[in-house]
Amino acid sequence: MASLVPTRPIVIDTREQTPWTFPDGIKTVRRGIHFGDYTLDGLDEIVAIERKSAMDMIGCVGQSRSRFEKHLYGLADLPFAHVIIECSMRALCETCSKTGVNVSSLVGTIIAWQAATGVHFWTPDDRRFATALAVRILFHSEKKWDQKLAQVGVGQNTPLHLVGEPTRLLSEAVDEYRGGSTLPPR
């Protein structure tokens, strides 16, 4: 069975204060990323994962909401965009209750954000599971993107800014992948 890890190095944003530790054999690099905390080398404009702790996520619904929403709509421009909250939904709701934030508001906001932007929100049980989930997300995003490149006759190592005419075809493929939906105005 083939290994389910990406072939490109995983890029960890330099602002990430408590980065995930990936298993041996997975190459990583640290550098600044425009959107998200994790991506793949060369695919910054294709895939991103934003990592949040329970308290971070609760803050995003409250006092940091406008900043997070701006960031979320930037993520939504990518074909593969994800937010991984490092706890189960139950643990997130329990933490929310302890802070005085309305649980229904938190859950409703996350659902509304996902529906409005198409960004996937994940709630794995813990940090270890979150790390494993991130590896799988990056692997499958890379695989799907490489298939799209192959469909338009572009090699996976061709820098996107040098692609030329196939860029239009890739854009159409991304729109098709998203179901042709357009995002609401910002």
Question: Where does each model-flagged region fall?
Answer:
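Non-catalytic C-terminal interaction segments of nucleic acid-processing enzymes
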Residues: M1-E45, D56-R186
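Conserved catalytic cores of phosphodiester-cleaving nucleases, focusing on short active-site segments
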Residues: V47-S53
